[in-house]
């Protein structure tokens, strides 16, 4: 079971110097607003993805009066352990795994798979299609070797095709034909992988949602819309839509326009589920990713939850904690109020109190 055994955070927002040994199971961080709870999660997020969920300007995360920030963790996993560290300051962003410099931020994500939930996680349902594509592609990134490179090849080719569409050159027709072939090759590979992974995720989402909702619910079904008509090949529709694409200046069809729809009893979950049920459904989507990762590679991921009690009553929190322990995930979850007796019945749980940038274990 992969988990962080030691965490060292320095000069990260209001967290001056935090060192702790978290539980390999669930870690609850309670404290008032602006105490540093979300900054704690953000630091782990930075360690796992090389970016923040709050800002694109990391300089704003450096504590006032300091030159740099640093986050280091010792990570235990099957077969050994490693040390991961990130630093940002005058020299820019630097990351290491053990003593090796990390050249691509995707290497961090491979070594420390993360899932993140917050009060804004409804965006996977309410937001545009790209959020549902991101949900699908998370599993492909962690389970399909080469998917990350394949996706970037597609993105670069899409950018080149769009450029040719906008720039009127004498040779544009020849160039567009070449880009159409490349784009369709990459695009159909991505689509095939997405369809296969969605099939694997669907049953897990349905089972997890039923377990968390704790009430009779029709099975969850999903519809994958690949981004162009299924009756034709991608290259064919790229050729057919060329005049429209050229007038519009962008590519209308392809996996960058794909969509996933979620249904319960044949109805869109956004219409049939209450707000609280939708939150439970969002947890089911995230946990299905973790479950598939473990079943496929016997690899755990770390789950970050901001505002754990938001839109969840005590019964739902109890079932969620039980399920998180059962799945063997390391969890860092924030709350305003201490959960106290609510967590005593669960094994492998530690609670920490966060106040004015200081984190202390509650005994």
Curated annotation (Swiss-Prot):
GO MF annotations in UniProt? ATP binding; single-stranded DNA binding
> Localized where?
Cytoplasm
Record's keyword terms, sorted: ATP-binding, Cytoplasm, DNA damage, DNA repair, DNA replication, DNA-binding, Nucleotide-binding, SOS response
Q: Which SUPFAM superfamilies match?
A: P-loop containing nucleoside triphosphate hydrolases
Biological processes annotated in GO: DNA replication; DNA synthesis involved in DNA repair; double-strand break repair; SOS response
One GO cellular component assignment for this chain's record is: cytoplasm
Q: Which InterPro entries match?
A: DNA-binding_RecF, DNA-binding_RecF_CS, P-loop_NTPase, RecF/RecN/SMC_N, RecF_2
Coiled-coil intervals: none
Q: Which residues bind ATP?
A: 31-38
Highest taxon, organism lineage = Bacteria
Biological role: The RecF protein is involved in DNA metabolism; it is required for DNA replication and normal SOS inducibility. RecF binds preferentially to single-stranded, linear DNA. It also seems to bind ATP.
> HAMAP family, alphabetically?
RecF
The similarity comment for this entry is: Belongs to the RecF family.
Q: What is this protein called?
A: DNA replication and repair protein RecF
Q: Which organism is it from?
A: Nitrosococcus oceani (strain ATCC 19707 / BCRC 17464 / JCM 30415 / NCIMB 11848 / C-107)
């Amino acid at each position: 079971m992969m988990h962080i055994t030691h965490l060292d955070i320095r000069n990260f927002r209001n967290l001056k110097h935090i060192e702790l040994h978290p539980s390999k199971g669930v870690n609850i961080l309670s404290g008032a607003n602006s105490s540093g709870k979300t900054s704690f999660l953000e630091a782990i997020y930075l360690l796992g993805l090389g970016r923040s969920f709050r800002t694109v300007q990391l300089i704003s995360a450096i504590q006032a009066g300091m030159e740099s920030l640093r986050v280091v963790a010792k990570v235990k996993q099957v077969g050994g352990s490693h040390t991961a560290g990130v630093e940002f300051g005058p020299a820019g962003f630097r990351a290491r795994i053990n003593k090796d410099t990390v050249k691509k931020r995707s290497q961090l994500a491979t070594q420390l798979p993360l899932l993140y939930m917050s009060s804004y996680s409804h965006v996977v349902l309410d937001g545009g299609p790209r959020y549902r594509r991101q949900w699908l592609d998370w599993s492909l990134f962690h389970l399909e070797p080469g998917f990350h490179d394949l996706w970037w090849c597609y993105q670069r080719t899409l950018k080149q095709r769009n450029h040719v569409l906008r720039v009127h050159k004498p040779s544009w027709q020849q160039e567009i034909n070449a880009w159409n072939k490349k784009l369709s090759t990459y695009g159909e590979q991505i689509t095939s992988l997405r369809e296969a992974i969605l099939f694997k995720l669907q049953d897990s989402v349905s089972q997890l949602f039923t377990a968390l909702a704790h009430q009779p619910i029709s099975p969850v079904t999903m519809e994958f819309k690949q981004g162009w008509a299924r009756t034709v090949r991608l290259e064919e529709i790229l050729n057919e839509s060329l005049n429209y694409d050229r007038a519009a200046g962008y590519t209308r069809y392809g996996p960058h326009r794909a969509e996933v729809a979620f249904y319960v009893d044949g109805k869109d979950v956004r219409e049939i589920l209450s707000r609280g049920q939708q939150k439970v459904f969002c947890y089911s989507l995230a946990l299905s990713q973790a479950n598939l990762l473990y079943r496929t590679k016997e690899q755990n991921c770390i789950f970050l939850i901001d505002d754990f009690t938001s839109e969840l009553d005590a019964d739902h929190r109890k079932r969620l904690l039980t399920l998180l322990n059962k799945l063997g995930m390391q969890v860092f979850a924030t709350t305003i109020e201490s959960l106290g007796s609510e967590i005593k019945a669960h094994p492998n749980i530690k609670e920490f109190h966060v106040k004015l940038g200081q984190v202390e274990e509650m005994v």
